[in-house]
């Protein structure tokens, strides 16, 4: 007689993909709206993007219960900051806060993989990419989530500066115009949904520039 062993994990991976691209005066952040577990789609209309400040937006994939808890912590700490300083956090400051928050939980981490994007104090686009325990870097572009292994090689091919080095450093911003960056992001997701079953349904795109924040959407594969 075989003995069955109970197996329970505090984590799940709800899939999904996030992409961010920074330009000279803009930032584009995009994510699909599919949330799934295993081979089951839980919902086709779940936004992975949240506005943290007037010039700062975060997109997250991974375990969405942990993501929601992380979002609440960041929102409450940003509210305290506003009461103490009478102003909103800058995007680089929010980037440091997110790193500290993730690192604080490193022994039982938030199972979330985040990209933070927005405009810095000079009006330049900025993108910060993270691992699950708070290690982060400012880059010109990044992707997180189940489709990132498909999208990052494509972004490297299109955007990484030519260099004789094997792994050249990224520039802090990309040379693309805002319209070119949006088209590139749409192409990335259209390709990724062909190969990644955890990415699909609908693409949500958030564009930040000096005029403010606007949103665009695009339909993706639903199978």
From Swiss-Prot:
Entry's family note: Belongs to the peptidase T1B family.
A Pfam family the protein falls into: Proteasome
Function: Non-catalytic component of the proteasome, a multicatalytic proteinase complex which is characterized by its ability to cleave peptides with Arg, Phe, Tyr, Leu, and Glu adjacent to the leaving group at neutral or slightly basic pH. The proteasome has an ATP-dependent proteolytic activity.
InterPro entries: Ntn_hydrolases_N, Proteasome_bsu_CS, Proteasome_sua/b, Proteasome_suB-type
Name this protein carries in UniProt: Proteasome subunit beta type-1
Keywords linked to the UniProt accession: Cytoplasm, Nucleus, Proteasome
PROSITE patterns (alphabetical): PROTEASOME_BETA_1, PROTEASOME_BETA_2
Subcellular location: Cytoplasm; Nucleus
Biological process, per Gene Ontology: proteolysis involved in protein catabolic process
Oligomeric and partner information: The 26S proteasome consists of a 20S proteasome core and two 19S regulatory subunits. The 20S proteasome core is composed of 28 subunits that are arranged in four stacked rings, resulting in a barrel-shaped structure. The two end rings are each formed by seven alpha subunits, and the two central rings are each formed by seven beta subunits. The catalytic chamber with the active sites is on the inside of the barrel.
UniProt keyword annotation of Magnesium present: no
